[in-house]
């Protein structure tokens, strides 16, 4: 899928703003780092003590005057997931972005039931964005 970078950036900003307003969450700064598997493995090792790739890592820093966060996304893993789940790359990318935002809003996915709730919320926002039916 070919998408102009400007259009993609605008779409990401729109979904970020929409999710945060809908979830009643205010953040001063969200930094996105789009990277490869090796980079996200390095972050996983350093901060989470995992030695494997993940599609996303989300950090919220509340020890500063600003409400600041980092969302790190492996585009290689997003691509593999889009193939595995028979989804378009863009839908999977936006699903992962929404997933990270939901973590910043306080949602967890550390149990099966919490994963189900989070997946429903991801689908809700993907539908509102017109990305899925």
Language-model features, listed with the residues they occupy:
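An acidic/histidine-cluster motif and surrounding catalytic segment
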Residues: 1-94, 105-133
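Catalytic acidic motif of RecA-like/P-loop NTPases
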Residues: 102
């Amino acid at each position: 899928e070919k998408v102009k970078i400007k259009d993609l950036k605008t779409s990401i900003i729109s979904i970020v703003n929409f999710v945060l307003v809908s979830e009643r969450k205010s953040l001063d700064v969200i930094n996105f780092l789009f990277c490869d598997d090796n980079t996200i493995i390095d972050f996983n090792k350093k901060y989470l003590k995992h030695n494997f790739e993940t599609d996303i890592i989300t950090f919220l820093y509340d020890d500063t005057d600003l409400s600041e966060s980092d969302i790190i996304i492996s585009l290689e893993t997003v691509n593999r997931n889009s193939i595995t789940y028979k989804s378009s790359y863009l839908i999977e990318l936006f699903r992962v972005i929404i997933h990270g935002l939901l973590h910043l809003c306080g949602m967890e996915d550390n149990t099966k039931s919490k994963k189900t709730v989070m997946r429903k919320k991801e689908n809700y926002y993907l539908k509102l964005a017109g990305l899925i039916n």
